[in-house]
Curated annotation (Swiss-Prot):
This is Aspartate--tRNA(Asp/Asn) ligase. Keywords: Aminoacyl-tRNA synthetase, ATP-binding, Cytoplasm, Ligase, Nucleotide-binding, Protein biosynthesis. SUPFAM superfamilies: Class II aaRS and biotin synthetases (SSF55681), GAD domain-like (SSF55261), Nucleic acid-binding proteins (SSF50249). Homodimer. The keyword Cell division does not apply. Coiled coil: none annotated. PANTHER family: ASPARTATE--TRNA LIGASE, MITOCHONDRIAL, ASPARTYL/LYSYL-TRNA SYNTHETASE. Residues 575-598 have a biased composition (Basic and acidic residues).
Length: 598
């Protein structure tokens, strides 16, 4: 080893020892005839002092981020010179030897200052030398180990599934890889290990997991990555409660890495209740504002805006004092979310109602409104009216925005809930309008995915009454973030074919794209279920950072570009020719002889 000790490990008990440290020059300070540097490695920082002779002369050429090795004697700092901000703040190393292991060019940004994201990603290897980004990756490693430990205790088998597979409709666009040996044909990078993990259950593995890389060619969305990581799990001979129970053990171990004792079991809420109370299927439960149903209250109204299939409200405490410009800003807030506006009523300190909506209400509607929605003098009541799904979503977004503006969210709180009893299907046009990909050509598409089993009560009726069919699905939500989702899977060929047909995937297409799965279901497939955790999002929450880019070693920018390597990049004409991108696929693709040697 080029060093005897880690820089962050030295303490007063080490005084008198001769040590060799290796790391980077974080700071250099000239104090008269003495030079101090902060020497940083992965463990922390130690102060090194160069006082005399050749070692002092050599230290004059040191600059920020030079990589060095220093030998010296550990000394207790003089009284009054201690630094209580760092663990090594009571000692320093009196240098006797200095070796420059690698010089540094002038830095594109100072590591102790905040740099722009583009520069940070382009020089990510420098960015990761900083304490915050570097520790985020170290935390991620601990999180991986914690999850693996729990799953090993419960007899899970870690299995790697293919990253070169065939393109199947799973809810997003595939990244395609040309198959050079079969010109005109393409592999697809997996959007998830979903189909392979189900095949592993058919294979009798019973308990599977992997920390899986997944790929989705999606349109730009804030804080999304084209390649991301899941903790993927699947179990045979289980019901939803069994998957939830083991998932909670994983979450408890993972949150213990930051010293938080997660109380179990976690609460559960139905999808219908989550939408009704919070306007979201991933409700943030760290604060108490809830939506109020007003449809029945306004059933006889003459106000045309409220003559709608759904009318709801959310109360902003103290919101009546907002200036007109701020209230106008709420209208823009609604328009950005695809709505015409956000109606409001202001409750005066004397209880009188103001604002443009109040004058359109009847005396009876005005008299009982404050009590109905639970408002107080000085509050603002926001309304949304229209189809229930869209209006509730607007009120749910308004609820979150109110909490942010009023500072109602405790940043140190953890609020978990399972959301259960999801609809099995959603209207395809609604899915498309929300920016999702509607799989199949039917009027209905799967809300989770096509392999989610219906609840027992919906098995016989989901194709005749799709709007009321419930799936045996469950999502886990933390602080308003969906951090995992799973379900009991379909394990019967006949039910899977009915689901495909419901989604507009006909028999021939189903056989072409999913025949391998359907065939497997013909050989004694066990009941099974599982879950996939968004590992990047979970790690970001644990690290206390806003973006998943902070917990990925070499992330892409928001547009899917890697500033470090300048990927994606054009290929050469020769590469294009060799890959067979433009070739017409042969209809009689060669098949591997099952008897041939591997």
């Amino acid at each position: 080893m080029l060093r005897t000790h880690a820089a962050g490990s030295l303490r007063p008990a080490d005084a008198g020892q001769t040590v060799t440290l290796a790391g980077w020059v974080a700071r250099r300070r000239d104090h008269g005839g003495v030079i101090f540097i902060d020497l940083r490695d992965a463990s922390g920082v130690s102060q090194v002092v160069f006082r005399e002779g050749d070692v002092l002369a050599a230290a004059h050429r040191l600059r920020a981020e030079f990589c060095v090795a220093v030998t010296g004697v550990v000394e207790v700092r003089p009284e009054g010179n201690e630094n209580p901000e760092i663990p090594t703040g009571q000692i320093e190393v009196n240098a006797t030897e200095l070796t420059v292991l690698g010089e540094s060019a002038p830095l594109p940004f100072q590591l102790d200052e905040q740099a722009g994201e583009e520069a940070r990603l382009k020089y990510r290897y420098l960015d990761l030398r900083r304490e915050g980004p570097g520790n985020a990756l170290r935390l991620r490693s601990k999180v991986n180990a914690a999850a693996r430990s729990v799953l090993a205790e419960h007899d899970f088998v870690e299995i790697e599934t293919p990253t070169l597979t065939r393109s199947t409709p799973e809810g997003a666009r595939d990244f395609l890889v040309p198959a050079r040996l079969q010109p005109g044909s393409f592999y697809a990078l997996p959007q998830s290990p979903q189909l392979f993990k189900q095949l592993l259950m058919v294979a009798g593995m019973e308990r599977y997991y992997q920390i899986a890389r997944c790929y989705r060619d999606e349109d730009f969305r804030a804080d999304r990555q084209p390649e991301f990581t899941q903790l993927d799990m699947e179990m045979s001979f289980v019901e939803a409660d069994d998957v939830i129970a083991i998932s909670e053990q994983v979450l408890k171990a993972v949150w213990a890495t930051i010293g938080y004792d997660l109380p179990l079991p976690l609460p559960r809420i139905s999808y219908e209740e989550a939408m009704r109370r919070f306007g979201s299927d991933k409700p943030d439960l760290r604060f108490g504002i809830e939506l109020v149903e007003c449809t029945e209250y306004f059933k006889d109204t003459t106000f045309r805006v409220f003559q709608a299939p759904y009318v709801g409200a959310v109360v902003m405490p103290g919101g009546a004092s907002q200036p007109r410009r701020t209230l106008d800003g709420w209208q823009e807030f609604a328009k950005q979310r695809g709505h015409k506006g956000l109606a409001y009523v202001l409750v005066g300190e004397d209880g009188t109602l103001g604002g443009p909506v109040a004058k359109n209400l009847s005396d009876a509607e005005r008299d009982g409104l404050v009590a109905h929605v639970g408002a107080n003098p000085g509050d603002c009541i926001f309304f949304a009216a229209g189809p229930a799904k869209g209006a509730r979503a607007l009120l749910g977004a308004t609820r979150i925005e109110i909490a942010k503006r009023l500072d109602l969210i405790d940043p140190n709180a953890w609020a978990f809930t399972w959301v259960v009893d999801f609809p099995m299907f959603e209207a395809a046009d609604e899915a498309t309008a929300a920016g999702d990909v509607a799989v199949g050509s039917g009027a209905w598409t799967a809300m989770h995915h096509a392999f989610t089993a219906p609840k027992p009560d919906s098995v016989d009726t989901f194709d005749s009454d799709p709007g009321n069919a419930l799936s045996d699905a469950y999502d886990i939500v933390c602080n308003g973030n969906e951090i995992g989702g799973g379900s009991i899977r379909i394990h019967r060929r006949d039910i899977q074919e009915r689901v495909f047909a419901m989604m507009g995937i006909d028999h021939d297409e189903a056989q072409e794209k999913f025949g391998f799965l359907l065939d497997a279901f013909s050989y004694g497939a066990p009941p099974h279920g599982g879950i996939a955790f968004g590992w990047d999002r979970i790690t970001a929450l644990l690290a206390g950072v806003d973006s998943i880019r902070e917990v990925i070693a070499f992330p892409k920018s928001g547009g899917g570009v890697d500033p470090l390597t300048d990927a994606p990049a054009p290929i050469t004409p020769q590469q294009r020719k060799e890959s067979g991108i433009d070739a017409k696929p042969r209809e009689d693709k060669p098949k591997e002889d099952a008897k041939s040697k591997a």
